[in-house]
Amino acid sequence: MESASPSATIRRRGVMLVLSSPSGAGKSTIARSLLENDHEFELSVSVTTRPRRPSEIEGVHYHFKTQRDFEMMRDGGDLLEWAEVHGNCYGTPRGPVERAIAGGRDMLFDIDWQGAAQLREKMPDDIVSVFILPPTMKELLARLTRRAEDTPEIIERRLRNAHHEIEQWRDYDYVVINDDLDRAFASVRAIVSAERLRHERRPGLEDFVAGLLAERPE
């Protein structure tokens, strides 16, 4: 039986990977591919006051809360970030994220720039943020239209919002232009691989290097 390689056994903190983009730029598609192909990642499950849809499963899609319970979590400091969208509240529970990161497990956040800013403020040393850009606004419109999920009015609103969202690109650690989905996905995976190797995230390196220096090869 082969023993694990030294690099695989060195203790590390997890990565909090934040993916943001305007609607239609490919953020959610890349997030799904990452979860399917990289089993070190877990998707952060948000809490929400929105009513559960028939197809949704508690604890898988969301943790569904009453308004009172949500406010208690918010006021008690139990949320890393939260926002109100279309009259419903959404937030990221603090406890599961902190336990995962301390245990060396990586967490994926598919959130907008406002949520990313709140996470960056709460856990700045653990965040790796990537902003996904469309190659052109014309292509963004084409993607939104091809989805056939929204009315022309909603598509127009999404395009207007996209301008403001794209203006936040400088706040992110990395920017990936999604002109080819496979290339964009490969870029995100390369970012993740490099960030996992940062020595600041690998407290176990201290003991490994000390042991390495203490060796006396025959």
Swiss-Prot record:
Per the UniProt entry, the Enzyme Commission number(s) are 2.7.4.8
**Could you tell me where this protein is found in the cell?**
Cytoplasm
Its recorded reaction(s) are: GMP + ATP = GDP + ADP
Query: One GO molecular function term?
Result: ATP binding
Entry-linked Pfam families: Guanylate_kin
Q: Which SMART domains match?
A: GuKc (SM00072)
Q: What class of enzyme is it?
A: transferase
Keywords for the protein's UniProt record, in alphabetical order? ATP-binding, Cytoplasm, Kinase, Nucleotide-binding, Transferase
Q: Report which superkingdom the organism of origin falls in.
A: Bacteria
Guanylate kinase-like domain residues = 14-193
Q: What is its main location?
A: cytoplasm
Binding-site residues for ATP, renumbered to this chain: 21-28
Q: How is this protein annotated for GO cellular component?
A: cytosol
Described purpose of this protein according to its UniProt entry:
Essential for recycling GMP and indirectly, cGMP.
Q: Which PANTHER family match?
A: GUANYLATE KINASE, GUANYLATE KINASE-RELATED
- Give the family per the record: Belongs to the guanylate kinase family.
For this entry, the protein name equals Guanylate kinase
Q: Which organism is it from?
A: Chelativorans sp. (strain BNC1)
